[in-house]
UniProtKB/Swiss-Prot annotation:
Keywords: Cytoplasm, Phosphoprotein. GO terms for cellular component: cytoplasm. It is found in: Cytoplasm. The gene is citD. This is Citrate lyase acyl carrier protein. Its main location: cytoplasm.
């Protein structure tokens, strides 16, 4: 899936996560992570985000994750929503998720 424009999903409320995604000139996923629990769960957060992006077919993007203690299911949903908005997709590919 090609990222066409900047988009975001989520909030900065407690137990949520804000995911910002935009196009990137360089190949690969460039991920920035800010989290209250980065020391403990930073690797897991990054792994979940990268897995979700891979399942959606995103190969090139700049992603900023600002986590406020979100559960894994919330993180996946926010990444999916941001990707759909950034790719200007209206049809959800349930098989990819």
């Amino acid at each position: 899936m090609e990222i066409i424009k900047d988009a975001l999903a989520g909030t900065l409320e407690s137990s949520d996560v804000m995911v910002r995604i935009g196009p990137c000139d360089e190949p690969g996923i460039h991920l920035e992570l800010e989290s209250l629990v980065k020391q403990q769960f930073g690797n897991a957060i990054e792994r979940v985000a990268r897995e979700t992006l891979a399942k959606l077919g995103v190969e090139r993007a700049h992603v900023v994750i600002d986590d406020k203690g979100a559960l894994e299911c919330v993180l996946r949903a926010r990444v999916q929503a941001a990707v759909m908005r950034a790719a200007e997709q209206t049809e959800i590919q349930w098989g990819a998720i």
